[in-house]
């Protein structure tokens, strides 16, 4: 890849910032944009370029959209200051948010009408893997979209799953992943706090269950947050009402019953209602603790 490959990352949260760092490390001429100016300045201190998005849009080879949801994605691409109409023909958009499959198909069609490739490219792996260029990307799009996006995929991903030649398949797979991930976090919290009622300490829970058949990646990643009493958000509680809501919308459209997903969603909604929405999603354990009068580590 020539060092002149030009990439903009829009959305410099915990995942997007890591994606931008990986693009920098991969030799891209990298721009970063966010609603929080300090995030832009921080990335610039690491080597990203300065510039207004509207001014540099026509020079980009790729735009990586790492925002919260479908509404923010659409606003970035086609809103009042929409990016896509300003991009040069043949450039590519990689859309990384968790969105409904039909939304991804619509964005692909709108981008294609303006000569822009669209890769449905939801990401997984957490902020550490984003920063180290080791994400898993569940991607779908035309062969030309994959080809145009290759330098970004090479810089940011350890594994790229090529799931089809049209947008939507990537987002469908991400929804399935989020079903499992959201349920696993909630059931980890349920199991840990049930154990506490029987005298099993959170520390011993993590030590033992992480080595047993009941473990999961989410248990091993999130349960230590509870043990440490550290709810600084790597992934917020507020993510899950949105993501599990997408899962249930897909299920409804398929006349598919998803009762376990629905039960997990309720726990996240209760957590958000308790004012925990901006805390790490491991804070769903506080719902269970409150219900039975338990004191979690680090609680006052």
What are these regions (language model features)?
Residues 7, 98-178, 182:
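Rossmann-fold dinucleotide-binding core
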Residues 11, 203-211, 262-266:
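Beta-strand segments within the central parallel beta-sheet cores of soluble alpha/beta enzyme folds
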Residues 30, 50, 117-119, 160, ...:
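Hydrophobic beta-strand scaffold residues
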Residues 53-117:
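Rossmann-fold NAD(P) dinucleotide-binding segment
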């Amino acid at each position: 890849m020539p060092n002149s490959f030009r990439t903009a990352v829009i959305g410099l949260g915990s995942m997007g910032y890591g994606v931008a760092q990986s693009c920098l490390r991969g030799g891209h001429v990298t721009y970063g944009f966010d609603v929080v100016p300090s995030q832009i300045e921080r990335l610039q201190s690491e080597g990203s370029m300065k510039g207004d998005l509207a001014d540099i849009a026509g020079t980009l080879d790729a735009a990586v959209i790492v925002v919260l949801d479908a509404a923010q994605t659409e606003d970035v691409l086609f809103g009042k200051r929409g990016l896509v109409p300003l991009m040069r023909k043949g450039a590519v958009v990689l859309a990384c948010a968790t969105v409904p499959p039909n939304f991804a198909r619509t964005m692909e069609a709108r981008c294609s009408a303006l000569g822009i490739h669209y890769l449905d490219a939801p990401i997984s792996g957490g902020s550490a893997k984003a920063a180290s260029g080791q994400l898993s990307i569940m991607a779908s799009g035309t062969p030309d979209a994959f080809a145009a996006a290759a330098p970004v995929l090479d810089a940011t991903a350890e594994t790229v799953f090529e799931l089809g030649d049209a947008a939507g398949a990537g987002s469908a797979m991400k929804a399935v992943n989020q079903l499992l991930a959201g349920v696993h976090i909630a059931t980890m919290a349920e199991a840990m706090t049930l154990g506490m009622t029987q005298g099993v300490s959170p520390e011993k829970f993590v030590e033992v269950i992480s080595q047993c058949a009941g473990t999961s990646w989410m248990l091993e990643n999130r349960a230590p947050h509870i043990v440490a009493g550290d709810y600084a958000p790597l992934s917020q509680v507020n993510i899950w009402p949105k993501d599990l809501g997408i899962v249930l919308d897909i299920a409804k459209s398929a006349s598919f019953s998803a009762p376990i997903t629905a039960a997990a969603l309720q726990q996240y909604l209760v957590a958000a209602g308790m004012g925990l929405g901006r805390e790490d999603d491991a804070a769903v354990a506080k719902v269970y603790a409150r219900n039975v009068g338990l004191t979690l580590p680090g609680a006052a």
